[in-house]
Design a protein with these regions (language model features):
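Catalytic-core signature of thiol
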Residues: 2-361
């Protein structure tokens, strides 16, 4: 018993003597249930901290086009790749989770990637909708500007935070509809992700356990609209559907996939002429989770395995590197105030052009 107490005290002292660890816990409001949990979390933090420092040293020497930083994910996952099942462009999982300062996180404590993946609730969802010929209309071969940023046109709402809920698909869907609604009406309305989380199960979505942007669009079309965020605020959990027709913020007629699939030139024409586009990406890499700024170039990122839905709001070039400007749903304390510049014209890196989709209003 005395030995156990002595060991526990040594662990507590060791973690307390790490100023970076103590600062990390303070900044992100981290709380742990036990000393053993804190020791494991501290180990993961140290691994990620070494990875970030090593990468940034190489980036400073010009070996990488982006930098990383420690953030709210740094005590949850290791540097190793997640395991994800192979999925096709017409059948993909788009879910991920986020962590906010001060949240009680003891119930999602993972020491291995397998435990983490199970905790995220990853699953394969099967499409139920029949393909409409209109979905696959080829993008017209038109000339577009070299640089596009729909934020400057007023077509993009503020960065949001999905919290402890695998609802990135809902944020991606609302983002593209917000843009199309603005371009048609001139009014930017923040739409309700919670409406989609709670009410689109019959279409095939799984709320906080994952979903599809296309099925979100089908729900909105069949439902006759989607509520505003103000009227139906986000709760980051599955709740009973309480859609209110008097709070309708936008609607749509159909949706279309950017075709040909996997074609970055087609996606560029879509983003350049249509507006913000919902896209699916591989976000499993530790480098993505710890992204800070610069053009994210990760050769190991899969072009065919997707687990995260985001919003392409523009594109351009920086210091000779082409990029996609992407809005994430992990809050403004991640990346470039919630955004990331992802490599463009790098063989469809991270699968960004594999299954892009947008609503028709």
């Amino acid at each position: 018993m005395r030995l156990f107490i002595f060991v526990a005290l040594c662990v507590a002292v060791a973690t307390a003597l790490d100023p970076e660890w103590e600062a990390f816990k303070r900044i992100y409001g981290k709380r742990y249930e036990s000393l053993s949990e804190e020791r494991a979390r501290h180990t993961l933090f140290e691994e990620n901290n070494r990875m970030v420092q090593r990468h940034n040293e190489e980036a400073a020497m010009g070996k990488h086009t982006f930098f990383m930083r420690i953030n709210k994910f740094s005590d949850l996952v290791t540097e190793k790749e997640f395991y994800l099942p192979t999925i096709s462009p017409m059948s993909f999982d788009v879910l991920h989770m986020d962590l906010s300062p001060g949240m009680d996180l003891h119930f999602i404590y993972f020491q291995t990637n397998e435990e983490l993946l199970m905790g995220l609730g990853a699953l394969r969802l099967n499409r139920t909708q029949q393909a409409d010929a209109e979905m696959f209309e080829r993008m017209p071969d038109v000339k577009v500007n070299d640089t596009v940023d729909w934020r400057q046109k007023g077509a993009v709402t503020k960065v949001k935070n999905q919290g402890l809920c695998g609802s990135c698909w809902a944020f991606s869907a609302t983002g593209s509809l917000e843009g199309q609604h603005f371009l048609k009406t001139g009014t930017l309305v923040s739409l309700s992700e919670q409406n989609l989380v709670d009410c689109s199960h019959e279409i095939g979505n799984k709320g906080c356990a994952g979903g599809y942007m296309e099925q979100a669009f089908v729900y909105i079309r069949d439902n006759g609209g989607i509520d505003t965020e103000e009227c139906y605020p986000y709760k980051a959990e599955n709740q009973k559907c309480h859609y209110n027709v008097t709070c309708n913020g936008a609607t749509l007629r159909s949706y279309r996939l950017v075709f040909p699939l996997f074609d970055e030139k087609a996606l560029q024409r879509a983003v350049g002429t249509i507006g913000p586009i919902s896209v699916s990406i591989d976000a499993t890499r530790a480098s993505f989770r710890h992204y800070s700024h610069g053009v994210y170039d990760e050769p190991k990122c899969s072009p065919t395995k997707f687990n995260h839905g985001v919003l392409a709001v523009g594109y351009g070039s920086s210091n000779g590197s082409d990029y996609w400007l992407v809005k994430n749903s992990w809050g403004t304390d991640w990346g470039m105030e919630g955004y990331i510049m992802m490599s463009r014209n790098k063989h469809n890196q991270c699968g960004i052009a594999s299954a892009a989709v947008y609503p028709v209003v």
